């Protein structure tokens, strides 16, 4: 077959559309525009698997993520179901639990992955400091989720975390992300963040500070010594800086910091090993301070919630410095409602995909 005049951006549409997107596209190409919206044809679940058993092959898996992002966006707010293994996007459709929502993801790449930084999870009940394992052999704060409620579309993701009765939703701007959590009634609801978490390894060192009763900021330094791209062979060396706000006051917050020995390997499989998880699970909770730095740290803010009360976390990201993260936050997402962010993300996709659509030429032979 021969194709003419199909720009690169259309490849995304073809990959993400049901039935390759050709049915909907050809209808409008004949002049019947109707209420056509290109974003309606995007299916982020296409390719969202790392399962060799489901695919029947070892190579050629999709390894995409279903979470929210914008065209060419630096931020991808997506569910993560697994940390170790051959798992570049952090998510695989057949997994039955979610361990959190990260703000950076790789998509469609081979080899062992990277990113998956700033892992945020809403929880209730007693605090747990590890996600545990997807196979259930080690428990933690990860939650089963209802596949029937899992929804993904251009610039938006949602799922019901059934272990907690919490609905989680995500959307994004080019340099920021937003999470909306709808909680059940309870006195021990929380948002917790694993700053060490990284797909295929861990951040080598992390830092977080409480700026005020709504704001946190910090960074995660990731190097080849602690895994990541190609389990360290890819020589990925980067720092993710963040500036985040929670709309519910942080009046009861704390940190945990695990004492990781100097001689411990902290790569792809080691960070989900029994000794490593036990060490993190035993980390002491620290309160009464406003900042902490270490090799494996976490943060939580705890509060009471009414039935169906919504709590929002917004975060700006930078790969340059903390000031850049703050500026991105203030320029793109400060004070914006979740629905506004999701609507604007969808509009960005419609605008980008419409450009590709107008240049679409179907196969000539």
Q: Model regions: which residues?
A:
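Cysteine-centered motifs
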Residues: 16-17
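C-terminal motif of bacterial Sec signal peptides marking the signal peptidase cleavage site
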Residues: 23-24
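Accessory carbohydrate-recognition regions in carbohydrate-active enzymes
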Residues: 31-360
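A short, hydrophobic C-terminal helix/tail in secreted or cell-surface proteins
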Residues: 361-365
């Amino acid at each position: 077959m021969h194709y003419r005049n199909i720009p690169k951006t259309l490849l995304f549409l073809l990959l993400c559309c049901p039935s390759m997107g050709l049915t909907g596209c050809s209808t409008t190409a004949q002049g019947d525009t109707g209420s056509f919206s290109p974003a309606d044809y995007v299916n982020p679940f296409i390719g969202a698997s790392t399962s060799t058993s489901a695919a029947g092959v070892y190579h050629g898996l999709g390894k995409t993520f279903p979470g929210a992002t914008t065209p060419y966006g630096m931020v991808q707010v997506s569910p993560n179901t697994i940390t170790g293994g051959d798992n570049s996007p952090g998510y695989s459709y057949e997994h039955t639990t979610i361990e959190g929502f990260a703000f950076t993801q790789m998509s469609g790449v081979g080899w062992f992955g990277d990113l998956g930084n700033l892992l945020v999870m809403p929880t209730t009940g007693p605090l747990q400091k590890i996600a545990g394992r997807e196979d259930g052999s080690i428990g933690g704060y990860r939650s089963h989720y209802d596949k029937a409620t899992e929804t993904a579309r251009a610039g938006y993701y949602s799922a019901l975390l059934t272990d907690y009765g919490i609905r989680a939703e995500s959307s994004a701007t080019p340099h920021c992300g937003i999470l909306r959590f709808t909680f059940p009634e309870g006195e021990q609801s929380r948002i917790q963040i694993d700053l060490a978490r990284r797909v295929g390894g861990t951040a080598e060192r992390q830092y977080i500070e409480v700026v005020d009763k709504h704001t946190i900021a910090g960074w995660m330094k990731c190097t080849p010594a602690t895994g990541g791209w190609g389990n360290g062979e890819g020589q990925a060396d980067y720092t993710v800086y963040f500036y985040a706000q929670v709309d519910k006051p942080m009046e009861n917050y704390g940190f945990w910091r695990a004492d990781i020995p100097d001689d411990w390997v902290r790569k792809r499989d080691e960070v989900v090993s029994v000794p490593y998880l036990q060490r993190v699970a035993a980390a002491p909770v620290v309160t009464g301070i406003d900042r902490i730095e270490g090799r494996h740290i976490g943060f939580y803010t705890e509060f009471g919630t009414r039935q169906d009360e919504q709590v929002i976390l917004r975060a700006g990201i930078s790969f340059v410095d903390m000031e850049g993260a703050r500026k991105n936050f203030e320029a793109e997402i400060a004070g914006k409602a979740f629905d506004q962010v999701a609507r604007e993300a969808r509009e960005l996709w419609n605008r980008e995909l419409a450009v590709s659509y107008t240049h679409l030429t179907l196969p000539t032979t």
